[in-house]
Structures are given as structure tokens and as C-alpha cells.
Regions:
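Soluble small-group transferase modules, centered on the S-adenosyl donor enzyme superfamily
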Residues: 4, 9, 78-163
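The AdoMet/dcAdoMet-binding core of the Class I SAM-like
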Residues: 1-69, 73-75, 81, 88-90
């Protein structure tokens, strides 16, 4: 199903929304990264709810990553970025968004201690720290009428991916 159409038809309210979309490699997919799309998501997110968005690499596609963050902020949500090493992708970025300010966890719940392979008490705080080459850069808001993310994504990944 088309996520955009589904959100337009849905009237529910959700405590957690997890968004894992295909890369914005064309305008049809790019519309899923616009203020129009995230406005629909914002309307479905409960007052104390959290939305998590898988974005792109803040290292290799830095401007694209921050364009998504800026776009979500433009619809009135607070964004808290984080990143993690994903073996098949490298350093990958995510965004937590909410209506209210979000404070990232500083420790793992006791019931998870020693039970996770990657996420450890030492790794957790580093997820929310961005080194200089991944920190926020100025970025445009991605809208249906400009689709800046599609061009930015293509330009940035074109530098990394051989043809």
C-alpha cells in the first residue's frame, strides 16, 4: 500500500510510529519525505507519542540526513537525531520525533543488561553524539513543490557509489 494514501484515510492516533521507507531516489518516493507526508504523520501521533524515522547515512549523505530532520521540524515536531553502525550499511542515521521535548535514555533498562549484542551501556550515550563531520548543516525543507531531497540524495550518494 501507499503510505501517503493510507495516512490520508486513517483517523487513528498512535503512541509509536516507526517509519522505514525506501530511499528517496525518485519523486514518487521523495513525496514520502515531504512536509505533506510528515504533517499527516504528525496528526496521527499521540500527544506523548514518539515517531522514529530511518533516514540515511549522516556521514555519506549529511545534507540529506539533516534535510529530513529539518522537514520534520517544519511540521512542528521536536527532532532528536541518533546514529548507529549497521553492518550492511555503515554508520546510519535515525530521527526520534515528538510533540514534546525528548530526553534520550542515559542507561539501559536493568532487564536488558547483558542480553543485547550491540547495544551496551557504553554504546548507548554515543548514539546521540555526532562527530564534527556528521553534525548539523544548513538544509532546506523538503516540500512537494520543491523535492530538494531527491536531488540532494542523488548528488551525495553519487559521490560515494561507483556507477
Amino acid at each position: 500500500d501507499d503510505a501517503f494514501k493510507w495516512l490520508e484515510a486513517d483517523t487513528g492516533s498512535y503512541d509509536v510510529i516507526i517509519i522505514d521507507l525506501p530511499d528517496p531516489t525518485n519523486y514518487s518516493l521523495g513525496k514520502l519525505y515531504t512536509t505533506a507526508f510528515y504533517s499527516l504523520v504528525e496528526q496521527r501521533l499521540a500527544g506523548a507519542g514518539l515517531m522514529v524515522v530511518q533516514t540515511t547515512s549522516p556521514l555519506y549523505a549529511r545534507e540529506s540526513f539533516w534535510t529530513v530532520a529539518r522537514t520534520i521540524e517544519a511540521v512542528g515536531l521536536t527532532v532528536h537525531p541518533y546514529h548507529a553502525l549497521v553492518p550492511s550499511f555503515g554508520d546510519w542515521g535515525y530521527l526520534i520525533a515528538s510533540h514534546r521535548p525528548y530526553r534520550p535514555p542515559t542507561r539501559l533498562p536493568a532487564e536488558l543488561d547483558g542480553k543485547l549484542r550491540f547495544l551496551t551501556p557504553d554504546v548507548l550515550p554515543g548514539l546521540f553524539v555526532f562527530p564534527a563531520d556528521m553534525q548539523r548543516v544548513p538544509a532546506e525543507v523538503n516540500r512537494l513543490d520543491n523535492q530538494v531531497l531527491v536531488q540532494t540524495f542523488e548528488r551525495e550518494w553519487g559521490r560515494v557509489t561507483p556507477e
